[in-house]
From Swiss-Prot:
Record-level GO BP terms: phosphate ion transmembrane transport
EC number of this enzyme: 7.3.2.1
Residues reported in the UniProt entry to bind ATP: G37, P38, S39, G40, C41, G42, K43, S44
Pfam families: ABC_tran
Subunit structure: The complex is composed of two ATP-binding proteins (PstB), two transmembrane proteins (PstC and PstA) and a solute-binding protein (PstS).
Topology in the lipid bilayer: Peripheral membrane protein
Name this polypeptide is given: Phosphate import ATP-binding protein PstB
Gene Ontology terms for molecular function: ATP binding; ATP hydrolysis activity; ATPase-coupled phosphate ion transmembrane transporter activity
Catalytic class of the enzyme: translocase
Keyword list, A-Z: ATP-binding, Cell membrane, Membrane, Nucleotide-binding, Phosphate transport, Translocase, Transport
Keyword Iron among record annotations: no
Amino acid sequence: MEPKIKIRGVNFFYHRHQVLKNINMDFPDRQITAIIGPSGCGKSTLLRALNRMNDLVSGARLEGEVLLDNENVYSPNLDVVNLRKRVGMVFQQPNPFPKSIFDNVAFGPRMLGITAQSRLNEIVEKSLHQAALWDEVKDNLHKSGMALSGGQQQRLCIARVLAVEPEVILMDEPCSALDPVSTMRIEELMQELKQNYTIAIVTHNMQQAARASDWTGFLLTGDLIEYGRTGEIFSRPKDKRTEDYITGRFG
């Protein structure tokens, strides 16, 4: 099967500081790919390169290609707004807007020009169902998203991404601010979502990567040390540095 996203020969710089070094990596369609490695190794930079979130940072520069369905997302004429619709992002800290639960989810569709209330109602309900939040909030859609628990807020943010019908979901440490029960719910949700979406997740949590992902890439000081099936990476790593990291010898 053709990968949904292919990274080919990517070097990434902030001004003169090189953060990623000749990265070649695939993100298979409708699979979960984890990016692991110690702090400062370039994980989040790699993830954000997939939908050009790094463009917002002064001095950021990418060499190489990031191919989404074989189209280079760094082509000069590419519509970046449409790219970020196709490749959505869930951040480390839940970041609901200071609006109602309904308006949080409806925000993206409204920005895309959808105004019919009946259609917005459908999108909000479907997205909250997909994010496994509907049953908990269906009678309180008028209440502020800020009033939800941390785990509920993160699922609301996932619903907000789903509402614009992306093809890829990027998750940057989505459970680091959550308790174990909420973390388990997000991991279960990821397994449901991969039936329809390609997912890439950055995580510090080795157990989470082993449990939740199909593929894993290990980054160290900007180099992709090893990439492969998660079961292989965690049970039979080919590189001593990978073994040292996943067994806790450093990181």
